């Protein structure tokens, strides 16, 4: 029998907690015998004193096991269970293309996603722009759609990693969100509760990233790779660029529109194509569906070219309550803003930098993201047709198109976009889309 206050004291003093102590504390969080004050105290102790990798594995597994862990054996799927998680950014609509592409290559992707957080867009908010699409379903429906379509993207259900929900709510209001040990546990407990065989992490770097520096992003990627593999799930990570908006658009309906156009081949932004292909290839190799990068990319290009990936996206949408003709009539089904107008630069030159975070906040300011937890979103607003880093800017060349509902919204978004896009006389060096891969061998 342990005492919560003694576990807190031990961590406060910088000692490593045993697996049994961590399991006891997480069980207490799950059954409400440990209160918010004690959760907050342990979170702050971990923030200052950190956790060893063994402690992080124990925390992640205890949080994973605090609720239901999905099993897939009884479905006889005939393919590996594999997923991707992104630390979030602006215009990061990768999941909507990646899930169907990997499914079309023989993987099964049970993706449990999140809502928008701060300046970053949430995959669930994007899917909510599709009429009828249900992001909150029971586990039976989730398993059924994964089996039939090969992919389902839904929100966290109450019975998956419930301890994480309580811990996160306390971290959010006690300035302990930034602990890499606790971020690792929070991300992985939810992902591993899906019963994955392989996971690929997309850790963002740059002005629109969650982690403030390249070093912090690298540290998070290494922590996740070490802990996930320690918990028995084959995991690698890619560090990808978020120094500019990833897609051509940022918002909810506007990003779904771009995802559909990508899958059908109507338009593929080269940056998001590079990141999506790199992550998908990593997933196929990790899951044993391709032997190397070349084979993986050939398979992925084939399912884009033959329409199989697009067909699977349509099947997932229908399976989760969306329109049966969504892929054919997506433009009809997705909401549109009242005002769609360009914003121009005040002077000419080259785009030298972008405050990507500020561009995300411009979408939030128009109602496309949340200021408070219960906010209702306007799915139609957003930004599209972004200029890229290094492009030349003239007086008649728009920085972006603004999709707003009122003139007031348009004016505010326009000034935020103009402030966020830095213009100078010298063209900057091009940044890579993918900086590096981190696997077990790199730890």
From Swiss-Prot:
Any Pfam family matching the protein: PYNP_C
SMART domains: PYNP_C
EC number: 2.4.2.4
Keyword Metal-binding listed: no
Signal peptide (from-to): none
Molecular function via GO: 1,4-alpha-oligoglucan phosphorylase activity; thymidine phosphorylase activity
Catalytic activity, reaction form: thymidine + phosphate = 2-deoxy-alpha-D-ribose 1-phosphate + thymine
Gene3D superfamilies xref list: Nucleoside phosphorylase/phosphoribosyltransferase catalytic domain, Pyrimidine nucleoside phosphorylase-like, C-terminal domain, Transferase, Pyrimidine Nucleoside Phosphorylase, Chain C
Function: The enzymes which catalyze the reversible phosphorolysis of pyrimidine nucleosides are involved in the degradation of these compounds and in their utilization as carbon and energy sources, or in the rescue of pyrimidine bases for nucleotide synthesis.
PANTHER family membership: THYMIDINE PHOSPHORYLASE
Quaternary structure, from the entry: Homodimer.
Protein name: Thymidine phosphorylase
